[in-house]
Curated annotation (Swiss-Prot):
This is DNA-directed RNA polymerase subunit alpha. Homodimer. The RNAP catalytic core consists of 2 alpha, 1 beta, 1 beta' and 1 omega subunit. When a sigma factor is associated with the core the holoenzyme is formed, which can initiate transcription. Keywords: DNA-directed RNA polymerase, Nucleotidyltransferase, Transcription, Transferase. Its EC number is 2.7.7.6. SUPFAM superfamilies: C-terminal domain of RNA polymerase alpha subunit (SSF47789), Insert subdomain of RNA polymerase alpha subunit (SSF56553), RBP11-like subunits of RNA polymerase (SSF55257). GO terms for biological process: DNA-templated transcription. The keyword Transcription applies.
Amino acid sequence: MSTQGFLKPRSIEVEPVGTHHAKIVMEPFERGYGHTLGNALRRILLSSMTGYAPTEVQMTGVVHEYSTIPGVREDVVDILLNLKGVVFKLHNRDEVTLVLRKNGAGTVVASDIELPHDVEIINPDHLICNLTEAGKVEMQIKVEKGRGYVPGNVRALSEDRTHTIGRIVLDASFSPVRRVSYAVESARVEQRTDLDKLVLDIETNGVISPEEAVRQSARILMDQISVFAALEGAGDSYEAPVRGTPQIDPVLLRPVDDLELTVRSANCLKAENIYYIGDLIQRTENELLKTPNLGRKSLNEIKEVLAARGLTLGMKLENWPPLGLERP
């Protein structure tokens, strides 16, 4: 079947909005293709971009994350949260262990981390902790390359390592895309007024630019769709490569707290043993409405936050829950 009759975008514009934030406008598309491609690209941008994140930390004198360090204003939990906000970029390597040492009164920021020549920090002024006169902090930070969001407990079980006292495994958010949304507007070509204009609004953490993020997501989509092109022709056959353990969308492994629901809605879900987004999307509207103290208003709130992530209630998941997923 020929696809020559389908319109392709003749105009692609990148409109900078701020630092690492841009709108990418493409037109024209055949009617309906704006939503078809916009939603697909958005979901890939949110879940499948490769980035870098701290995955393990060892601090001198610290046994576990609920400790405190003498002379340091923040406790260890706050320090770890601040470390997660440091944006790393590795060149020509997949992992690295970095060292941070500092003592004496003052602030400790990302630029105080000792870096080899092929590691870069995008936000060097990011605060890690504050020290008093007697304060001292020394730590090793392991940074890895990865994709999506991987909870620390899942990764710790999949990595057959001997547990070291003081080794703290972090939840890792590798995605360099902080926010993405799309809108479809009307476009016109000559006498045709029923066409689509796609506007992608993308903000990244600086590891990649918004336009590079779109290029990478498009390549991923093309690679996945190419499998279906092999079905063309009755005599042709295609043998898909054998896969190992089924992959779970990293978004589904996030706790429902990440949806930023109201306290009432979040507590109602946890009372029904719904702790992860993957648990939630498998419930139907009727099932949730039977939950004590969860009314129509809370249900609408849940549906809205799921829709913003391209998800709905009543979805079916295979191989859920994944092996090693902990329940609170």
